[in-house]
Amino acid sequence: MGKKINPLGFRLGANQSHRSLWFAQPKSYSRGLQEDEKIRDCIKNYVQKNMRSGSEGISHIEIKKKIDLIQVIIYIGFPNLLIEGRTRGIEELRINVQKGFRSVNRRLNIAITRVAKPYGQPNILAEYIALQLKNRVSFRKAMKKAIELTEQADTKGIQVQIAGRIDGKEIARVEWIREGRVPLQTIRAKIDHCSYTVRTIYGVLGIKIWIFVDEQ
């Protein structure tokens, strides 16, 4: 039963917070959600085009909206991927995102916050595993290496799951590995989670990661 519900939504208000902070009337609520999605997509596309490494390194993106301002905070594990050798990197990103959606009366402000322990973030870890799978590294080797990286971030437990046509086998299957404790049913346990999709030469693989950060 522990895998039937999203661990982030299950803990909202306890030890997880919303990543979009704004208020809208019911008629314009869907428009606000679409706007958030466009902003996140624009940022990820820009980082993919301008990065030197094979991964984005973005942990998550927070969006705060006011009447005349949209504040975007990018939590990134490796800021150099975005701004290395580019003095106007953030300004270029802001202009690029501004073009992606129509916002005449609101200013767009983008800030970058560095994540202290990048490999303690499930999104960054999933990108690492995806990159290994694209390079035809064995899925078991990729999962074990990911767990080794997580141990450096002082986490209490991790579970990694890969589903699909693993290693090009004709029948799709699910493989998973767990290290330490991952108490999914304990609400006071802070658990970070992500679902990530990667396209390989054999087809689409789904990666899910649960990281037990701490107990409050």
UniProtKB/Swiss-Prot annotation:
Main location: plastid
Location of this chain's protein in the cell: Plastid, Chloroplast
SUPFAM superfamilies reported in the protein's UniProt record: Prokaryotic type KH domain (KH-domain type II), Ribosomal protein S3 C-terminal domain
GO BP term, example: translation
Limits of the KH type-2 domain: 43-116
Top-level taxon of the source organism: Eukaryota
GO CC annotations, alphabetized: chloroplast; cytosolic small ribosomal subunit
Subunit structure: Part of the 30S ribosomal subunit.
Record's protein name: Small ribosomal subunit protein uS3c
Species of origin: Drimys granadensis
